[in-house]
């Protein structure tokens, strides 16, 4: 976060949870609510929304020595996007931009259906995020392998803020969505890239498709939910996991993907 900030890339105000005086200065300067986030972990695991200073200090004292593994961040209401990329010798050779239906933090705290859907590269938000993602990767000196980055578009001013990045493939079946819409299996390509590098060979990305797609995942009331009723021809993948429901829809028609995502999200909520 500090490296990205020093590169002039916009991001929410933050403070490491180490020095108590610095934390107090942050809480006096940045109005609540805040977000207390693990510096490790994946997705929205372990993230706490903090309403006021009393609640913050309760969490910090409760964490004890583990508090230093957290970062305190300004809460920015907005729409959250993710950028999944593959970088070779410092050059981003593959990038895919998607937008979450609801921010993962909201889904993990309040429940509901987790959804995300791809954006075409011609979309203005995608264009802005491809550029911003490249700036983040360059600032961090990442030269080799996959990245999964998240950004938020502020409701207040419509500007993008960098949230976080990890040098790994995205979780929560995001890699399955990327594979279904582009033909690029990020896990397999990461392995191929490592093998080519170890052998001193040149890595070549496979042909990339540019389809539209959406992913839906949620907890299920049934032990093994019946997914056969979700039978649109655009459904290309279904989750087979106890107490879970999930699927991916893919089409050349962006509006068809959005209509199916909305319809199936409503049905997931009822079923």
Model segments located where?
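Short loop-to-beta-strand entry elements in the cores of soluble alpha/beta enzymes
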Residues: 146-150, 217-219
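Short beta-strand-to-turn element immediately C-terminal to the catalytic PLP-Schiff-base lysine
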Residues: 17, 47-52, 86-88, 120, ...
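ATP-dependent carboxylate/phosphate-activation module, predominantly the ATP-grasp catalytic core
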Residues: 54, 74-80, 84-142, 146, ...
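Conserved N-proximal alpha/beta basic substrate-recognition cap immediately N-terminal to
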Residues: 1-28, 255-257, 262-263
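The start of beta-strands in P-loop NTPase/AAA+ ATPase cores
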Residues: 32, 68-69, 145, 159
